Regions:
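Short juxta-domain linker segments that transition from a proline/glycine-rich
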Residues: 1-287
């Protein structure tokens, strides 16, 4: 078969399922891939096929293999999406197609990492073995977690990230520029976590302020340690005063800035000029 020959054995129901899964129409698909709408409509009506290049573009768009669209029968969602993915999709049904693709890309990277770890001598490689935390005392939970991570008094996002990865949590930060690893600036999602007993994952959206990224990182860690579940969070979740979000917000705040750090602030030394507050609180801000 040459690249220009048309493949006739395409399963149109699988294209329809992918469009529904991504929340797009056939017109959207055609527009995004620069394929004539009429061509896709003929495929959906089983009146014509499409070239291998066209099918490959559709497969890459949905993050699937070409053979996925040649298989007969309906899609088994339990085989296509992991339980963690379905958890995130159920929490935020309005997730964009690009963000869903990013979640699946992160899952694939985790699979690659675990596969490499099996092939290599991984006896000394960190494994995710979280401490038992009290859910009824969030300050104590934060103290235990901070000790588990081995944090110093002053930290940055990179040192927090290194501490988590030393405990078997994979941490990704999205790109600030357009690309496959970007969470779009206009997208309200700030981060997500994938709970897995073998290898948990946290993804943090790149933001202007590093302190915001650090809070998002520890917010997601709270979901993993306190609730042992996957989660995806936006600005509203990181300011929520209800339920699990309230708990992980309190946990993240206490982990980043323990009460002992707050009591070390001397009000008598507070500068009269507000512009000097950054330098006055520099050590506490880098906790």
């Amino acid at each position: 078969m040459t690249l220009m020959e048309r493949i006739q054995s395409i399963n149109p129901k699988r294209i329809a399922w992918c469009c529904a899964d991504y929340g797009i129409t056939l017109d959207d698909l055609a527009s995004d891939l620069s394929i004539a709408v009429a061509s896709i409509e003929r495929v959906m009506a089983r009146e014509d096929g499409m070239t291998f290049n066209q099918l490959r573009k559709i497969a890459e768009y949905f993050g699937r293999g070409v053979l996925f669209f040649l298989e007969t029968g309906p899609v088994d969602e339990a085989q296509v999406h992991t339980p963690q993915f379905r958890t995130l999709a159920n929490q935020k049904p309005e997730l964009s197609a690009k963000l869903k693709t990013l979640i699946e890309r992160v899952e694939k990277q985790r699979e690659v990492y675990l596969s490499l770890r099996e092939d290599l001598d991984d006896a000394d490689r960190p494994r995710f073995s979280p401490p038992v935390l009290p859910n009824d005392d969030l300050q104590e939970a934060a103290r235990i977690a901070r000790q588990w991570l081995g944090l110093n008094e002053q930290n940055s996002f990179d040192s927090y990230r290194e501490a988590l990865e030393s405990r078997g949590v994979l941490v990704f930060r999205s790109n600030g520029y357009n690309g496959k690893w970007q969470i779009a600036k206009e997208n309200p999602i700030l981060g997500f976590s994938l709970y897995d007993q073998a290898c948990a994952v946290i993804v943090v959206k790149k933001q202007e302020w590093e302190t915001r990224q650090s809070f998002t990182l520890m917010h997601e860690l709270g979901h993993l340690l306190l609730h042992k579940t996957s989660s995806i969070d936006d600005e509203g979740d990181l300011q929520s005063h209800r339920g699990h979000e309230r708990e992980v917000n309190a946990f993240a705040g206490s982990l980043l800035v323990p009460d002992a750090f707050l009591t070390s602030i001397s009000d008598a030394e507070r500068p009269g000029d507000i512009s000097q507050y950054d330098s006055w609180l520099e050590r506490q801000r880098k906790a």
